[in-house]
């Protein structure tokens, strides 16, 4: 099986609720864009040729979970749009396969709106994983009951807060497809959620973002630079291939890491966090 994991290991200092050091493994995808099968083996770009595909990812995840049952799996949005499967079945294939992968959470990309709100409601009800987005106001839609601003997960004795951020819809999505949904400032919303998660004594706070890296509009860099208390961003939207974590200084001067895996799930990001208790 061709491996499709980018592995990044880094040490993370935190005020752990327990005395001993901890380790946490995170796998993540973004902008898979309905890439059901591997890319063509005949592509000139050998870094992409014959990579990806849901069957491979499902098999790889089984292997990874056999080694580490406590791992976390996240998606940063735009699992929709990009193949005839999505055009014909409007997301049923993609969500069905994601269910087999047992995601812990996903956020919303702009292409999730491509068939309108009713289709999003149908798909999110089908998903066996939570959808998180903190900066959209879903008031007046059925999505208000289906999308949470954040979730709190527990792994290996750690309390992990996870929230989502999504891009401005105007100019990306036809107005009829998002209707009354209101986009709010991601920086303001992020800080509000971070404060709530800190108050709930989370050991680690992760943002799964579809804002984009080094992109026009509010980007992941701006969210990190304009907030305090965030620990890690798993990005999407800009289709950026990061071979190592990129760091941005937050309001307290702490360097916060960002990771992103390009598109089509050619790579699955793997982060191994060594959680060290602050002295």
Residue spans of the language-model regions?
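Bacterial Sec-dependent N-terminal signal peptides
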Residues: 1-21
């Amino acid at each position: 099986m061709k491996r499709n994991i980018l592995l990044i290991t880094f040490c993370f200092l935190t005020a752990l609720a327990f005395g001993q050091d901890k380790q946490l493994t995170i796998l993540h995808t973004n902008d898979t864009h309905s890439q059901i099968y591997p890319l063509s083996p005949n592509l000139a770009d050998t870094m992409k040729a014959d990579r990806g595909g849901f069957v491979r990812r499902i098999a790889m995840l089984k292997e990874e979970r056999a080694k580490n049952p406590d791992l976390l799996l996240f998606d940063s949005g735009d699992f929709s749009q990009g193949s005839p499967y999505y055009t014909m079945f409007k997301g049923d294939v993609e969500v069905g396969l994601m269910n087999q992968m047992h995601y812990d959470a996903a956020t919303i990309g702009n292409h999730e709106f491509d068939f309108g709100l009713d289709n999003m409601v149908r798909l999110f009800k089908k998903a066996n994983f939570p959808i998180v987005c903190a900066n959209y106001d879903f008031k007046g839609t059925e999505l208000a009951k289906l999308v949470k601003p954040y979730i709190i997960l527990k792994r290996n004795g750690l309390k992990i807060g996870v929230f989502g951020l999504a891009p401005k819809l105007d100019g990306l999505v036809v107005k009829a497809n998002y209707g009354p949904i209101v986009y709010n400032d991601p920086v303001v919303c992020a800080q509000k959620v971070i404060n709530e998660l800190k108050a709930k004594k989370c050991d680690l706070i992760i943002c799964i973002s579809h804002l984009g890296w080094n992109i026009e509009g509010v980007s992941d860099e701006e969210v990190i630079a304009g907030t305090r208390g965030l620990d890690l961003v798993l990005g999407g939207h800009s289709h950026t291939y990061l071979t190592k974590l990129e760091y941005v200084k937050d309001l307290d001067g702490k360097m916060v890491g960002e990771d992103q895996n390009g598109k089509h799930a050619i790579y699955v990001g793997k982060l191994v966090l060594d959680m060290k208790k602050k002295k």
